[in-house]
Each structure stands twice: as structure tokens, then as C-alpha cells.
């Protein structure tokens, strides 16, 4: 007798497919001239905002499961986290293109411009989380150490919000909203019992 798939098994793949749609629209805009006079700058902004939005949604999954009873939210947390990392890498890649892949200019930016430093640090923090996102990593590291490592996502999100704030010159309503939402999610996480933070079965 064939095993029935677990409830909401389609959610993870569905989130990934849906979450990749903005890249299709971005590519279309790039090819059709829809990104304006400075397409690299516009694409950099769009992918950076997408990375922070999707990362924030991933952080909302545990509070949604614990406090609202939305058990399905746990099944999309990993997919959202990987999507956020994808957009962060894409954001950085477009920035590199804007710098003509000049290592000297990039190093100068990273070491002398806090705006770039914060974004680069956020990206570096996300990479080990991606590499240890599988169930095998939980077994190898042990749940306690794995959990401690993956709490770095909150620091990465905070640095991403700071990067966003410093990157906006006039209207800070968007960065301010990001900071407030992340602060609320961090507080919700602190009030979540540790036993309820285990990764959901995929």
C-alpha cells in the first residue's frame, strides 16, 4: 500500500516556485528596458528588498505556528530561508556587476562604507545557514548546536535591515517598518518555549 504524502507536502516546492517568479519579472524588465536609466542600481535595490522581505517571512513562520496554530507555516520556513539566501546572493552578484567585478573597488567598499559592510556581513552569516539547512546537519551537529548556529539568522536580518536603512537617503518608512517587524519577531521568538522550536519534518 503506497504511503500517503504528509499534509501540506506541496507547500515547500510551491513556495520555491512562486518565490522565484520575481526573478522572471526582473529578467523581463532588464531585457525590455523596464529598469530605467540605471538598471544595475534598480535591480540591486529590488533583489535586496526581496531578500529582506522573504527572510522576514521565514522568521515569522515559528511565531505563526506557535501563537496562531498555523502548523503549515513550519513546512515553508526552510524554503523561505533558502529563497532569501538566493536573493541575497543575487543582490550581491548584481552589485559586483555594477562594480565591474573590480576586487579593489569591492574591497574598498566593504572596508570603508558601513552600508556595504553591513550587507556583506549579513550575506556571510546566511551562507553557513544554507550549508547546514538539511536534516543531516541537525543530526551531525546535534539539535542544540544546530539551533545556536541558526539563531544567527536574526543577526543577519538585523544587519540586512541596517543595510537597507543606510541605503535609503530620504524616505526611511520602509526600513523603519522592517526594523519594527523584525523586533516584534525577535520578541516573539524569545517568548517561544525551546521545545517548540524544533525543525518541522519536511
Swiss-Prot record:
InterPro entries reported for this sequence: Fe3_Rdtase_TM_dom (IPR013130), MsrQ-like (IPR022837)
Subcellular location: Cell membrane
Keyword Transport belongs to the record: yes
Claim: Transport is one of the keywords in the record: yes
Cellular component terms (Gene Ontology): plasma membrane
Record keywords, A-Z: Cell membrane, Electron transport, Flavoprotein, FMN, Heme, Iron, Membrane, Metal-binding, Transmembrane, Transmembrane helix, Transport
Principal location listed in the UniProt entry: membrane
Ranges that cross the membrane: 8-28, 50-70, 76-96, 114-134, 148-168, 174-194
Obligatory cofactor(s): FMN; heme b
Cofactor remark: Binds 1 FMN per subunit.
Mode of membrane association: Multi-pass membrane protein
Record family assignment: Belongs to the MsrQ family.
Subunit structure: Heterodimer of a catalytic subunit (MsrP) and a heme-binding subunit (MsrQ).
Function: Part of the MsrPQ system that repairs oxidized cell envelope proteins containing methionine sulfoxide residues (Met-O), using respiratory chain electrons. Thus protects these proteins from oxidative-stress damage caused by reactive species of oxygen and chlorine. MsrPQ is essential for the maintenance of envelope integrity under bleach stress, rescuing a wide series of structurally unrelated cell envelope proteins from methionine oxidation. MsrQ provides electrons for reduction to the reductase catalytic subunit MsrP, using the quinone pool of the respiratory chain.
PANTHER family in alphabetical order: PROTEIN-METHIONINE-SULFOXIDE REDUCTASE HEME-BINDING SUBUNIT MSRQ
Protein name from the UniProt record: Protein-methionine-sulfoxide reductase heme-binding subunit MsrQ
Amino acid at each position: 500500500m503506497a504511503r500517503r504524502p504528509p499534509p501540506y507536502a506541496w507547500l515547500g516546492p510551491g513556495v520555491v516556485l512562486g518565490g522565484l517568479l520575481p526573478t522572471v519579472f526582473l529578467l523581463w524588465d532588464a531585457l525590455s528596458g523596464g529598469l530605467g536609466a540605471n538598471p544595475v542600481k534598480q535591480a540591486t535595490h529590488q533583489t535586496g528588498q526581496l531578500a529582506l522581505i522573504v527572510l522576514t517571512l521565514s522568521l515569522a513562520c515559528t511565531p505563526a505556528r506557535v501563537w496562531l496554530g498555523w502548523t503549515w507555516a513550519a513546512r515553508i520556513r526552510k524554503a523561505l530561508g533558502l529563497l532569501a539566501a538566493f536573493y541575497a546572493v543575487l543582490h550581491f552578484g548584481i552589485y559586483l556587476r555594477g562594480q565591474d567585478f573590480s576586487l579593489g573597488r569591492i574591497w574598498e567598499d566593504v572596508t570603508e562604507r558601513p552600508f556595504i559592510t553591513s550587507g556583506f556581513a549579513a550575506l556571510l552569516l546566511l551562507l553557513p545557514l544554507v550549508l547546514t539547512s538539511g536534516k543531516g546537519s541537525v543530526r551531525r551537529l546535534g539539535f542544540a548546536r544546530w539551533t545556536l548556529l541558526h539563531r544567527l539568522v536574526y543577526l543577519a536580518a538585523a544587519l540586512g535591515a541596517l543595510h537597507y536603512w543606510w541605503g535609503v537617503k530620504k524616505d526611511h518608512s520602509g526600513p523603519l517598518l522592517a526594523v519594527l517587524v523584525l523586533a516584534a519577531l525577535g520578541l516573539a521568538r524569545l517568548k517561544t518555549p525551546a521545545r517548540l522550536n524544533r525543525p518541522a519534518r519536511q
